[in-house]
């Protein structure tokens, strides 16, 4: 049963327990999860399935999302490459489908947006590598090829004047140093598989143009790989397959949920509930809501491991967080569920993983340490805990931070690692914790916030967590974090997109849980009123550095 909001006290400003109650109620009542639509997914769905509800909204939204410099997407230019390629492809497809609109005012906007995007893509420097986002090594080269195919199909005499010069000598040979991937090369790669790996279902839109029928996944029970774009591509290449109308209905319901737009993963309820619960538990905010927490965790604690979203295989990250919560809440679940992910001195996030994840291994360390604390007389996990702690310490950067493939910000990775090491890393982790705290102190912005591209409440919460887990938490800097978070605790707009999927997204409820729980921990740690460094102005919101 969903939480009955009517039985809860109204949320007093910055009153953590009441705010947590309302957050849990909203999560419990939402079967989708709270995440942001993205330019990439919306553009790819529109290119594959323009018939879906919200066509006009998608086109207008994509046009409105273009930045002044010609790119699309969040973050710095390296992050904007993929959404820009997707947006250009979608707008070129729109012009191709409706040539009669080419010389209309809308056609002019479409053509100008495409021309500006292509011009900027041509001029991008590639000094910074592309981010380690999902399947970027397939998606970017494949989209370069698709853009070029669409450019080659333009009739210069019929094109809008803004596009007329584009096809001639303006093909994209490479973007950000990444060359196009010819379709026959992609087909050769796919020919190596007897069965398409499940991890590639999420990016099937990149494979669909050349995927042989024998490799096309069977009709999924959910969105293919929890991706609307992958599902739209599957439908476009398997329209006669049994169950295709059901998938079309799923896409239509996703479009209805997001106003014609699409997030990169739907639905995120498993991931959302686990991260919200473990974050609130850390601050002691779950005691009142243990029946709800047990219900969620009991439903998720599958014997074969926990997939973060429908259509994915189980992964060590979600499984470890489930084990940690189950152990704390008294829900039966055993650490052997993590054994398939063990790889030497650490754990793979999922089978067939290309790059390791420090946040996943931090969650495993926390889960095994928690299990050992609750079950001291059972199987000994001490050696695994020691190896994991050493593996994490060895991956700390010289300035004191960690980074991770699941999040753009080093504050996220560092907070997750220090949370685990401070509890289960032993004395040998103390120096690493001090280095992390020193890095946080040295990277504070002058407006009292922290952030990789600009100060955010989310990253400020992570910074405070790192300091709280330090051997000697600095009261003055914690007071600064408290003041900044308190000034922004009632912000109700969407948080900045910092989490990695195919591009950047923002899991709203998880971010709000991080801020809530951090304020709760700070309230309990600091004297009242919390100290504020001299000259601190909580009202400042502009760039600090």
From Swiss-Prot:
| Alphabetized UniProt keyword annotations | Isomerase, Magnesium, Metal-binding, Plasmid
Specify where the region named Disordered lies, as residue ranges: 526-545
Q: Which domain of life is it from?
A: Bacteria
Q: Per the Swiss-Prot or TrEMBL record, what residue ranges does the short sequence motif RXXDGSW motif cover?
A: 444-450
Per the record, what are the reactions this protein catalyses?
Answer: (2E,6E,10E)-geranylgeranyl diphosphate = (13E)-labda-7,13-dien-15-yl diphosphate
What is the required cofactor set for this protein?
A: Mg(2+)
EC number annotated for this UniProt entry: 5.5.1.30
Enzyme class name: isomerase
Motif annotated as DXDDTA motif, chain positions: 315-320
Q: Which GO terms describe its biological process?
A: diterpenoid biosynthetic process
Molecular function terms from GO: isomerase activity; magnesium ion binding; terpene synthase activity
Q: Any signal peptide, and if so, which residues?
A: none
Give the domain note: The Asp-Xaa-Asp-Asp-Thr-Ala (DXDDTA) and Arg-Xaa-Xaa-Asp-Gly-Ser-Trp (RXXDGSW) motifs are expected to bind to Mg(2+).
Protein purpose: Involved in the biosynthesis of the labdane-type bicyclic diterpene labda-7,13(16),14-triene. Catalyzes the conversion of geranylgeranyl diphosphate (GGDP) into labda-7,13(E)-dienyl diphosphate.
Question: Which family is it part of?
Answer: Belongs to the terpene synthase family.
Q: What is this protein called?
A: Labda-7,13-dienyl diphosphate synthase
Q: Lineage, please?
A: Bacteria, Bacillati, Actinomycetota, Actinomycetes, Kitasatosporales
């Amino acid at each position: 049963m969903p939480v009955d909001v009517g039985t809860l006290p109204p949320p007093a400003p910055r009153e953590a327990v009441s705010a947590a109650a309302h957050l849990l109620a909203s999560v419990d009542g939402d079967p989708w999860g709270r995440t942001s639509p993205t330019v990439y997914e919306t553009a790819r769905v529109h290119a594959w399935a323009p018939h879906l509800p919200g066509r006009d909204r998608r086109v207008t939204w994509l046009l409105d999302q273009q930045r002044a410099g010609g790119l699309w997407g969040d973050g710095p230019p390296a992050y904007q490459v993929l959404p820009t390629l997707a947006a250009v492809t979608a707008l070129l497809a729109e012009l191709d489908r409706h040539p009669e609109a080419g010389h209309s005012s809308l056609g002019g906007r479409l053509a100008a947006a495409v021309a500006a995007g292509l011009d900027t893509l041509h001029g991008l420097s590639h000094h910074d590598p592309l981010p380690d986002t999902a399947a970027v090594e397939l998606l970017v080269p494949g989209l370069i090829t698709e853009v070029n195919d669409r450019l080659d199909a333009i009739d210069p005499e019929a094109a809008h004047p803004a596009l007329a010069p584009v096809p001639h000598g303006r093909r994209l040979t490479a973007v950000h140093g990444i060359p196009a991937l010819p379709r026959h090369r992609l087909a050769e790669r796919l020919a190596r598989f007897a069965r398409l790996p499940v991890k590639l279902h999420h990016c099937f839109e990149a494979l669909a143009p050349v995927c042989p029928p024998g490799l096309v996944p069977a009709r999924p029970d959910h969105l293919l790989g929890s991706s609307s774009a992958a599902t739209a591509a599957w439908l476009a290449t398997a329209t006669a397959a049994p169950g295709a109308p059901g998938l079309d209905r799923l896409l239509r319901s996703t479009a209805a949920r997001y106003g014609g737009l699409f997030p990169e993963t739907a639905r995120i309820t498993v991931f959302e509930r686990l991260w919200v619960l473990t974050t609130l538990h850390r601050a002691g905010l779950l005691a009142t809501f243990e029946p709800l927490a047990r219900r969620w965790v009991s439903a998720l604690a599958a014997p074969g491991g926990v997939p973060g979203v429908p259509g994915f295989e189980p992964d060590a990250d979600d499984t470890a967080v489930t084990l940690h919560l189950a152990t704390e809440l008294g829900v039966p679940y055993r650490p052997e569920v993590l054994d398939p992910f063990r790889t030497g001195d650490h754990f793979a996030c999922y089978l067939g993983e290309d790059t390791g994840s420090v946040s996943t291994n931090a969650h495993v360390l926390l889960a095994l340490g928690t299990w050992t604390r609750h079950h001291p007389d059972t199987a000994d996990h001490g050696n695994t805990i020691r190896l994991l702690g050493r593996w994490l310490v060895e991956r700390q950067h010289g300035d004191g931070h960690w980074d991770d493939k699941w999040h753009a910000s080093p504050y996220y990775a560092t907070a997750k690692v220090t949370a685990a090491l401070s509890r289960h890393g032993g004395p040998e982790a103390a120096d690493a914790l001090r280095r992390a705290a020193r890095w946080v102190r040295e990277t504070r912005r002058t407006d009292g916030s922290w952030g990789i591209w600009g100060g955010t409440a989310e990253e400020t919460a992570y910074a405070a967590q790192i300091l709280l887990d330090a051997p000697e938490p600095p009261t003055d800097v914690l007071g600064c974090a408290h003041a900044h978070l308190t000034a922004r605790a009632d912000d109700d707009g969407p948080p900045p997109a910092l989490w990695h999927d195919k591009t950047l997204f923002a899991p709203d409820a998880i971010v709000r849980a991080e801020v809530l729980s951090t304020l709760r921990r700070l309230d309990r740690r600091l004297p009242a009123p919390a100290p504020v460094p001299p000259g601190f102005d909580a009202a400042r919101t502009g760039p600090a550095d």
